[in-house]
């Protein structure tokens, strides 16, 4: 399975999770990350909240984000009046939802690891 297919499957898993929660809806943004306009991987919401979500699934102990990727998420969220979130799954574990401000910043990128995700992150049932 290609990296692209794995990413799409991870996004779909999150979308199904939102639809299982009463009053919530979610959809995948096709082409996110590959067009010149800022766009998250997933948009989710209910009658009172909107979430812009960047989704990652990794077998590694670390997940890196280019600074531009996070900047685009924040820009989209601001323009759409949505809450920016990052959903990360390490080693086929649960998805942890982090706020961009919780990521560790290096000179050129942002990074999250499983310990950070468990300490600072939320499971989906805690962000809805």
Stretches found by the model and what they are:
Residues 5, 83-128:
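Domain-level recognition of nuclease-like catalytic cores that cleave nucleotide substrates
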Residues 1-31:
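Acidic-basic catalytic patches of nuclease active cores, encompassing PD-(D/E)XK
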Residues 18, 42-59:
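Conserved catalytic cores of phosphodiester-cleaving nucleases, focusing on short active-site segments
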